Amino acid sequence: MIDGDGYRLNVGIVICNNHGQVFWAKRYGQHSWQFPQGGIDDGETPEQAMFRELYEEVGLTHKDVKIIASSRHWLRYKLPKRLVRWDSKPVCIGQKQKWFLLRLECDESKINMQKGSSPEFDGWRWVSYWYPVRQVVSFKRDVYRRAMKEFASLAMPFRERKLKGKKVKRRG
């Protein structure tokens, strides 16, 4: 679905583990990495689209994860002009995304990128929480930063949150 402003309705998915790391996926046949994401079909809610994309791209179901949060607002990015398909109707100039933070509740061996009809990814790894913001393609960077900032306090392991909340005495 494309909205009246030319943005494709989409979901972004951040999967975290119990160590505060996030799932980082390598795009099929490319050297670029990103979070799982995908379009919202007509008649689908963002949550339904998220679970469909999660299964198609990562092979996980609603039983394998727990929803920790979803973004308060839709986050948008524009595509570089060279990536816009000007001959398509309607023209899509970017993505309008609802983001979800999930916690993996199953063994990571259940991750299977071959479940969908055409795989989106051919590799993955756990990375530190803020790593994706520095590594994602530049036109997605601001949306990643905003989503990750919104989810940060919920994704960090409890111990790290507790330490960050302590006041530090200054000397001198």
Swiss-Prot record:
This is RNA pyrophosphohydrolase. It is an enzyme of class 3 (hydrolase). It comes from the Bacteria. Pfam families: NUDIX. It comes from Vibrio vulnificus (strain YJ016). Residues 6-149 form the Nudix hydrolase domain. InterPro entries: Nudix_hydrolase, NUDIX_hydrolase-like_dom_sf, NUDIX_hydrolase_CS, NUDIX_hydrolase_dom, RppH. Belongs to the Nudix hydrolase family. RppH subfamily. GO terms for molecular function: mRNA 5'-diphosphatase activity. Accelerates the degradation of transcripts by removing pyrophosphate from the 5'-end of triphosphorylated RNA, leading to a more labile monophosphorylated state that can stimulate subsequent ribonuclease cleavage. GO terms for biological process: mRNA catabolic process. A motif (Nudix box) lies at residues 38-59. The keyword Hydrolase applies. GO terms for cellular component: cytoplasm. CDD domains: NUDIX_Ap4A_hydrolase_plant_like (cd03671). Keywords: Hydrolase. The keyword Nuclease does not apply.
